[in-house]
Amino acid sequence: MMNFFNFRCIHCRGNLHIAKNGLCSGCQKQIKSFPYCGHCGSELQYYAQHCGNCLKQEPSWDKMVIIGHYIEPLSILIQRFKFQNQFWIDRTLARLLYLAVRDAKRTHQLKLPEAIIPVPLYHFRQWRRGYNQADLLSQQLSRWLDIPNLNNIVKRVKHTYTQRGLSAKDRRQNLKNAFSLAVSKNEFPYRRVALVDDVITTGSTLNEISKLLRKLGVEEIQVWGLARA
């Protein structure tokens, strides 16, 4: 859609020549991708399916897709999306993640999943925020990729402290018994799924959820994230 209505870039506020996904070409170019391990997401000098980091401490999931590092301007957009009630940024961020998924089909031979599962929030935190940011991203991706968004399969049943600032050991302890499944193995037909999250740090949350999904018979778990911190 051409910019007949003086649309502006959501980051720099400059005029958009084409008002489609909210970012001008200059700001989008600042969000740089990098070669990463297709398993754990660690930065590498070239694209690879595995690396020394994930072989040393293998994550519970199988594949990872990320947009870029948690640095500006991507980090600013994520913070506004999560903490400043700017839920309408979901389309812009989901579009960037969609492009990263498409790239991963080429760089990491990624096969699209049969279903998408957003990382859940504890009900009180979601009520206070007003939305689950991962679910908003999943809804957009579900529509564009024509893949079901299963936002009621994994439940967060325990209130946990924020993960920011915790060590890897404390993160694991904080998340112990924090999630549960809302379906049984017989009720879940999907064998390849993607977990959608915002910022991936140690991966403790994703590991806990991945272990539960294995109990449902899931054979391949992909992680789709906005940024690697």
Swiss-Prot record:
Functional description taken from the UniProt entry: Involved in transformation (genetic competence for DNA uptake).
Protein's GO biological process: establishment of competence for transformation
One Pfam family recorded for the sequence: Pribosyltran
Family affiliation: Belongs to the ComF/GntX family.
Coiled coil: none
Gene: comF
Transmembrane regions: none
Domain of life: Bacteria
InterPro entries, alphabetized: ComF/GntX_DNA_util-trans (IPR051910), Competence_ComF (IPR005222), PRibTrfase_dom (IPR000836), PRTase-like (IPR029057)
Keyword terms of this UniProt record: Competence
Record-given protein name: Competence protein F
